[in-house]
Amino acid sequence: MFVIDWFYGVLASLGLWQKEAKILFLGLDNAGKTTLLHMLKDERLVQHQPTQHPTSEELSIGKIKFKAFDLGGHQIARRVWKDYYAKVDAVVYLVDAYDKERFAESKKELDALLSDESLATVPFLILGNKIDIPYAASEDELRYHLGLSNFTTGKGKVDLVGSNVRPLEVFMCSIVRKMGYGEGFKWLSQYIK
């Protein structure tokens, strides 16, 4: 319950009380999207089959509701991502920090998302997952391979109002160890309108 209570407290303290948000969970297959969604929903770690069809979960934490869409990350599932861009409030893009051979593929998909006009003002939280595995990429290494070294906006409370800059930041995490993603969501929550 600690993570849920903490998450609720963060959102409430940042003015997201009684708000609704639509958040897309995107990334290549096996990055941890479904695992994260279930961890946020009921703090359970379960083995999942690859997501074959888009799924959504309504998460209520206190009086805050958000609808999270897990669209799958395999090649065929990526074709429908665009169908979910309308009225999205944030994108959480997961990358398997251990699977360095797929960084180029992940960068290609992320670049397509970042250049899509319908997502031009949408905040992006990039989560480098699986840092609990030895030899997983560091944050700097992941930023470099995703081409984000000079494009992130800062981890603190950065006022971007009127700047025409899209909030975008990288956080490293281990969903199975329940670490790192909370800080990412805290950062993201300040930019959800």
From Swiss-Prot:
Q: Which domain of life is it from?
A: Eukaryota
**Chief subcellular location:** endoplasmic reticulum
User: How is the activity of this chain controlled?
Assistant: Small GTPases activation is mediated by guanine exchange factors (GEF), while inactivation through hydrolysis of the bound GTP is stimulated by GTPase activating proteins (GAP).
Cellular component annotations (GO), alphabetically ordered: COPII vesicle coat; cytosol; endoplasmic reticulum exit site; endoplasmic reticulum membrane; Golgi cisterna membrane
Tissue expression pattern: Expressed in most tissues.
Q: Write out the residue ranges of the motif STAR.
A: 2-4
Which keywords does the record carry?
Cytoplasm, Endoplasmic reticulum, ER-Golgi transport, Golgi apparatus, GTP-binding, Hydrolase, Magnesium, Membrane, Metal-binding, Nucleotide-binding, Protein transport, Transport
Task: Say which family it is in.
Answer: Belongs to the small GTPase superfamily. SAR1 family.
Subunit structure and binding partners: Homodimer; upon association with membrane. Part of the coat protein complex II/COPII, composed of SEC23/24 and SEC13/31 heterodimers, that it helps recruit and assemble on endoplasmic reticulum (ER) membranes at ER exit sites.
Xref: NCBIfam families: small_GTP (TIGR00231)
Give the protein name, as stated in the record. Small COPII coat GTPase SAR1A
Which species is this UniProt entry from?
Answer: Brassica campestris
High-level lineage = Eukaryota, Viridiplantae, Streptophyta, Embryophyta, Tracheophyta
Q: Which gene encodes it?
A: SAR1A
